[in-house]
Amino acid sequence: MIEFHNVHKTYRVAGKEIPALHPTNLRVDDGQVFGIIGHSGAGKSTLLRLINRLETPSGGQIVVDGEDVTALDANGLRRFRQQVGMIFQHFNLLASRTVADNVAMPLTLAGDMPRKQIDQRVAELLERVGLSDHAKKYPAQLSGGQKQRVGIARALATKPKILLCDEATSALDPQTTASVLQLLAEINRELKLTIVLITHEMDVIRRVCDQVAVMDAGVIVEQGKVADVFLHPQHSTTKRFVQEDDQVDENEQRDDFAHVQGRIVRLTFQGDATYAPLLGTVARETGVDYSILAGRIDRIKDTPYGQLTLAITGGDMDAAFARFTAADVHMEVLR
């Protein structure tokens, strides 16, 4: 478990104190995929780098598996960091070393494993990330996705308990991003590894994360289960991220609906309710008519969800709305 207790970070620039992270309390449970989302300058990289003490907090306490890592000396910090792997946006591979040598680097530097065991471990890792045939290649011979897979294999070399991902998919195309996220999900599931990732893309959060924290100007403005935050955003920053992911401008959408008659509502379905024939049932029971103005069906990690924007006319609207609520469908009246 990772815990932040009133942790904050301030940089001194040109004689001025610049806060990068305001006092923050945070908890990441073992085995979770925890996402931190924010625009540039939000403080997410600072928060991530505080976990493995690449940054030293200005105050507060960071506790990992019951150990106060803010109190560790140099030897203790070296031991702790062997339990934390990290992958980066731009891969950080050594161009003059082969794929196998890059993956072996953490084990070689640790100096406590025979070469034969290192080679066996590297072979296992390359097989896990699907690069067994690329062991003798150099980074320049690899695609971006393959480079990131090497980075993931290297991060797993010391069998860490925690994997930190610093914008790990930002430099990749959408198809490659999807394959890397699938690999991270498999690693989390099979190795029971705790993963903390930062990103500026809500789609990344939606695909792989269990919990999310939304950051703005060094403050966590909203956090919770991904489904709750994604489907029912409260803070303006979160709402902007959701709109960017939906590629929908709500102001433009309101203009489009200006001529539509009736009450306009947005329904959100989760799990099995996503595929249930609820609209037809409610229409028959209450006598309402409806027009579908917009809709989508997608998944949040392994959970299906659907959103429909409807124009409802006629019949007993109050009874229809009560029926939606009774079926555990979240309803938002837009007009």
Swiss-Prot record:
It catalyses: L-methionine(out) + ATP + H2O = L-methionine(in) + ADP + phosphate + H(+); D-methionine(out) + ATP + H2O = D-methionine(in) + ADP + phosphate + H(+). Keywords: Amino-acid transport, ATP-binding, Cell inner membrane, Cell membrane, Membrane, Nucleotide-binding, Translocase, Transport. It is found in: Cell inner membrane. GO terms for cellular component: plasma membrane. It is a peripheral membrane protein. PROSITE patterns: ABC_TRANSPORTER_1, ABC_TRANSPORTER_2, METN. ATP binds at residues 38-45. The keyword Transmembrane does not apply. It is an enzyme of class 7 (translocase). Its main location: membrane. CDD domains: ABC_MetN_methionine_transporter. Residues 2-242 form the ABC transporter domain. GO terms for molecular function: ABC-type D-methionine transporter activity; ATP binding; ATP hydrolysis activity. The keyword Membrane applies. Its EC number is 7.4.2.11. The complex is composed of two ATP-binding proteins (MetN), two transmembrane proteins (MetI) and a solute-binding protein (MetQ). Part of the ABC transporter complex MetNIQ involved in methionine import. Responsible for energy coupling to the transport system. Belongs to the ABC transporter superfamily. Methionine importer (TC 3.A.1.24) family. This is Methionine import ATP-binding protein MetN 2.
